[in-house]
Amino acid sequence: PEDVNVFSMQTGNPTVPAYLADASFYYDDRTKTFYAFGTNDGAGGENVYPAQMWYSKDCKEWKNKVIAFPKSWTDYAGTLCVWAPSIEYNPDTKKYYLMYSIASNTFVGMADDLLGPWEDANGAAPGKMLFKGYDGQFFMDDDRTMYIVTDSWHFKIMKLKFDEAGKIYIDNSDPVFAKSDSNPFIGTYHYTQIEEIKNAFEASFIFKRNNLYYLMWS
């Protein structure tokens, strides 16, 4: 890309010539391809836009592609601090979902292919942010219920639901998610909060193994 010199000046990245902090690495069984998305900042703090993703069949030869965000995202949030993407595939909707925070405004997109094109996936407020926060990560449970874990210090977990077109909504019907917040676009939404974790800061991530749930953070 035109700005690859900014990426490669001081990173010493052995895999791709990119500064790929907060990397979201995804292997897709459907395409037999590895994909890498990451925070969009230069090694010295420079902003590098538009965001890019990298993909490879063998983790040796990599290609990159610019991610074209819906224009309404950057019209509202700008192009600085494009952080911490997350990728998930929902077999029920047959859509890929991409989540990015831009200046602590979190947006979700969807596509039929990880190479795009990406369209806005916010069902409650099309083209707008889903919630205020950053470092949001998807988690899909064994029953295909999807969640988002996000924020810093006290991590929030939100439950998701989808309409027939594959658009995302925050599911407010589960009484377990008893706390509430709001924003001017989607109104009130519910979540549960993970509190009192010693030294918890940001970048929360959930995975499941042998029927146990694990929460990671920085």
Residue positions per predicted region:
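Carbohydrate-active catalytic/glycan-binding domains of CAZyme proteins
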Residues: 1-218
